Amino acid sequence: MTRYVISRLSAIALLALAPALALADGAQDQLKAFVAKVQSATGDFTQSTVGPQGRTQPAQSGSFAFQRPGKFKWAVARPYEQLVISDGKQVYQYDPDLAQVTERKVDQAIGTSPAAILFGSGDLDKAFHVSPLPDRDGLQWLRAKPRNADAGFSQVDIAMNGDLPARVELLDAFGQTTRVDLSNIQANPKLPAAEFHFTAPSGVDVVKM
């Protein structure tokens, strides 16, 4: 499992555990409020990717959950099942069609990808240039650009609506834009520990990276 794959499948995680941002009013303040007030959440997502030539890949949809610090589940239900789940120490990607599970340590898997914002182990400003964007589609936006030229992506735009994340748009190093729309967000539910526990199904290949 590459960091690039994780950054796509866990795009919701970009919003979950970011360090508080002492920035200007607008999307930055809303993200700060979300981080301060929301310790866990569940919701639904739709995800689509458009290539540099305008070619659109099949849309995905599913559900997500997260809990600070560092736990999340990103479950693709359609058109094909796929699961990325973190227990805070390990990240697992399960692909039923391939009958394969890939396992990495959280730090190794996330590295300097956008999902590093999820874990909030350091100062966001040290890893990203963060700036406000003009309002668009009735949402307030911010942009984070990696300071590391080898991050594998160019920028990630995050849209906020009423102190809740509404959309993520990731531009990768290949010129592809992945858009994730979030809905039905429930803030601060009580989530059982088993929500972020993963055991590989019998008979599948387990690859440890």
UniProtKB/Swiss-Prot annotation:
Localisation per UniProt entry: Periplasm
GO CC annotation terms, alphabetical: outer membrane-bounded periplasmic space
Alphabetized UniProt keyword annotations: Chaperone, Periplasm, Protein transport, Signal, Transport
Keyword Zinc-finger annotated: no
GO biological-process terms attached to the record: lipoprotein localization to outer membrane; lipoprotein transport
Classification via CDD domains: LolA
Record's keyword annotation contains Nucleotide-binding: no
Signal peptide: 1-24
Family to which this protein belongs: Belongs to the LolA family.
Subunit description: Monomer.
PANTHER family named in the record: OUTER-MEMBRANE LIPOPROTEIN CARRIER PROTEIN
Protein task: Participates in the translocation of lipoproteins from the inner membrane to the outer membrane. Only forms a complex with a lipoprotein if the residue after the N-terminal Cys is not an aspartate (The Asp acts as a targeting signal to indicate that the lipoprotein should stay in the inner membrane).
UniProt cross-references to NCBIfam families, sorted A to Z: lolA, PRK00031.1-3
Name listed for the protein in its UniProt record: Outer-membrane lipoprotein carrier protein
Annotated organism of origin: Bordetella avium (strain 197N)
Taxonomy of the source species: Bacteria, Pseudomonadati, Pseudomonadota, Betaproteobacteria, Burkholderiales
Gene: lolA
